């Protein structure tokens, strides 16, 4: 494995911490008036999303992770694994439930996703920012029923449940923001 000195560490760099890949979100070089210089590093574990802050000496080294973000097309799910294909090389990989990271509720087929590969296997899947999905079940909106905040739950074709405005009906196609899980607009 490759290592990098603390002078080479930058935001966005992917490192290994206890054999788990992490991405550096913030670095701060500190040179006190007395004593040895050090670097304060904040990083986020890719699999769990947990953020940790660590102080390292200027002479310390970090292990660089073999992590690659690749654009891949979602093909299908066989119930246990979700299958993705690289559109350029036609190489296929399969992600388990832990590797999907909750993205499975937004994918219906043939969406382009960013798949994070660690040592050749997927550890995180980022769905497109917006997806268009059909509403399979929702209560009809009753005129004048705005006392509950003006929204109602709707089940989408992938099984995800989002809050939609009262005017949206069953069998309509809506646009959903996958980052927040919120309704964005109706698709004409």
Curated annotation (Swiss-Prot):
What NCBIfam families does this protein's entry cite?
efp, PRK00529.1
Role:
Involved in peptide bond synthesis. Alleviates ribosome stalling that occurs when 3 or more consecutive Pro residues or the sequence PPG is present in a protein, possibly by augmenting the peptidyl transferase activity of the ribosome. Modification of Lys-34 is required for alleviation.
| Subcellular location per the Swiss-Prot or TrEMBL entry | Cytoplasm
Q: Which InterPro entries match?
A: Elong-fact-P_C (IPR015365), NA-bd_OB-fold (IPR012340), Rib_uL2_dom2 (IPR014722), Transl_elong_fac_P/YeiP (IPR020599), Transl_elong_KOW-like (IPR013185), Transl_elong_P/YeiP_cen (IPR001059), Transl_elong_P/YeiP_CS (IPR013852), Transl_elongation_fac_P (IPR011768)
According to its UniProt entry, the protein's GO biological process terms are:
peptide biosynthetic process
- What is this protein called in UniProt? Elongation factor P
Processing after translation: May be beta-lysylated on the epsilon-amino group of Lys-34 by the combined action of EpmA and EpmB, and then hydroxylated on the C5 position of the same residue by EpmC (if this protein is present). Lysylation is critical for the stimulatory effect of EF-P on peptide-bond formation. The lysylation moiety may extend toward the peptidyltransferase center and stabilize the terminal 3-CCA end of the tRNA. Hydroxylation of the C5 position on Lys-34 may allow additional potential stabilizing hydrogen-bond interactions with the P-tRNA.
Superkingdom of origin organism: Bacteria
Query: Tell me, what's a Pfam family for it?
Result: EFP_N
Q: Name one GO molecular function term.
A: translation elongation factor activity
Main localization of the protein described in the UniProt heading: cytoplasm
Sorted alphabetically, the keyword list is: Cytoplasm, Elongation factor, Hydroxylation, Protein biosynthesis
Q: Name one GO cellular component term.
A: cytoplasm
Please give the family membership noted in the entry: Belongs to the elongation factor P family.
Residues that the record marks as modified (N6-(3,6-diaminohexanoyl)-5-hydroxylysine) are: 34
Q: Which PROSITE patterns match?
A: EFP
SMART domains noted in UniProt: EFP, Elong-fact-P_C
The pathway that the record names for this protein is: Protein biosynthesis; polypeptide chain elongation
Task: Tell me the classification of the organism that encodes this protein.
Answer: Bacteria, Pseudomonadati, Pseudomonadota, Gammaproteobacteria, Lysobacterales
